[in-house]
Amino acid sequence: MTMLNPKKQISKPNTLIPNEHGFYGIYGGVFVPKELIVPLAEIADCFNNTAFTKEFQDELFYYYKNYVGRPSPLYYAANISCGGAKIYLKREDLNHTGAHKINHCIGEVLLAKKMGKKRVIAETGAGQHGIAIATAAALLGIECVIYMGEQDVKKEYPNVLKIKTLGAKVVCVGSGAKGLKEAVDAAFDDYLKDPETQMYAIGSVVGPHPFPLMVASFQSIVGKEAREQFLEQEGRLPDNVVACVGGGSNSMGIFSGFFADKTVKLTGVEPAGKGLETGLHAAPLAKGRVGVVHGFKCYFMQDDKGNPMGTHSVASGLDYLGVGPQHCYLKDSGRVTYRSACDDEAVDAFFMLSRKEGIIPALESAHAVAYALKLSKELGKDKSILVNLSGRGEKDLDYVLSLYGKKYGVDI
């Protein structure tokens, strides 16, 4: 495994770089069957030697600008800021496909093509990564297979239809808890069968090296843009940057723009589900222990014997038992503070943003909005908060309204 080669780079990403073995402190690494060691090393070499050449970057940024619609806007949400700190939203929900996921998906599929792969495979929870990979695969002319837990297929069925419409195959995973963990398990099993002709295009800053580095690097465009936009609009940096954390790709993306700015507080918001005290949550940084899962070392939800535990979140995209190694390192170092928001808080923020600003957020993003609303009241009018609005919420409407519609006055 090699690190980024600075001689080849034309635009070094402002993100955490692991050591030569893929570790961020004690987290990360490569814990996989021996059959995957060489294929993963080949992906790392291709990324290190190709992804930051002028040719690759020109193609990537052509698609970012003309296909994705970057830069995404920075919006001052005055109506929800009333009486507290100014809340700004980085509008990743306005990207093509409706979320931040397209940023790394185009990069991953471009790499797969450079390596001569015939197919990309991926897992998805809420469906946003599945849509983004299927979109990039259609754009670049490569076969695509998406693994999705049966529970999430039912919950996010509009996204399943979109994935199929884009020409990708959806494999419904019915084992275990039928969620994101099982989808990842199935995707890894498929990748293990044929790593020569296909590439696993992982959906977050998780998995064995080089996946966490790759995804974080492609997502760093979010933080770079947000920093420049905030300085332009406010003439200074934000006091706080807030983002939801499941695997952790959107938060790594926006945090990366501010790592060097010690006056800027960074806060990741995990899903507290029914409450951290209930065990029905997906908050490994708050309640997990260090171990190895899905090929890398991280905090993850496990029992006293080290076996993976079930998780719960109203947001499928956050319902994962582990978290990216960069986040584990940032938690231990203290550079990022991690908090949580429960299901009810996220749903309340979902409706508040919809009704106060006319923006329907993804349930995942609503966790960050929920925490920002509380923080805004604590800080006061002279402070500012930047929130990464990582996705839009049309995908969640059927599910949210079926469970919470009556409470919020919506008849269905």
From Swiss-Prot:
Question: What cofactors are annotated for this protein?
Answer: pyridoxal 5'-phosphate
InterPro entries associated with the record: Trp_synth_b_CS, Trp_synth_beta, Trp_synth_beta/beta-like, TrpB-like_PALP, TrpB-like_PALP_sf
Question: Pathway it belongs to?
Answer: Amino-acid biosynthesis; L-tryptophan biosynthesis; L-tryptophan from chorismate: step 5/5
Q: Which GO terms describe its cellular component?
A: cytoplasm
Q: Is Lyase one of the keywords UniProt gives this record?
A: yes
Alphabetically ordered keywords of this record: Amino-acid biosynthesis, Aromatic amino acid biosynthesis, Lyase, Pyridoxal phosphate, Tryptophan biosynthesis
- E.C. number: 4.2.1.20
Q: Name one Pfam family in it.
A: PALP
GO MF terms held by the record: tryptophan synthase activity
Q: Which SUPFAM superfamilies match?
A: Tryptophan synthase beta subunit-like PLP-dependent enzymes
Q: Is this entry keyworded Transferase?
A: no
Q: Which CDD domains match?
A: Trp-synth_B
Question: Where N6-(pyridoxal phosphate)lysine occurs along the chain?
Answer: K101
- Look up the domain of life of the source: Bacteria
Q: Which reaction does it catalyse?
A: (1S,2R)-1-C-(indol-3-yl)glycerol 3-phosphate + L-serine = D-glyceraldehyde 3-phosphate + L-tryptophan + H2O
Q: How does it assemble?
A: Tetramer of two alpha and two beta chains.
Function (record text): The beta subunit is responsible for the synthesis of L-tryptophan from indole and L-serine.
Checking PANTHER family in the record gives:
TRYPTOPHAN SYNTHASE, TRYPTOPHAN SYNTHASE-RELATED
Family, per entry: Belongs to the TrpB family.
| Protein name as catalogued | Tryptophan synthase beta chain
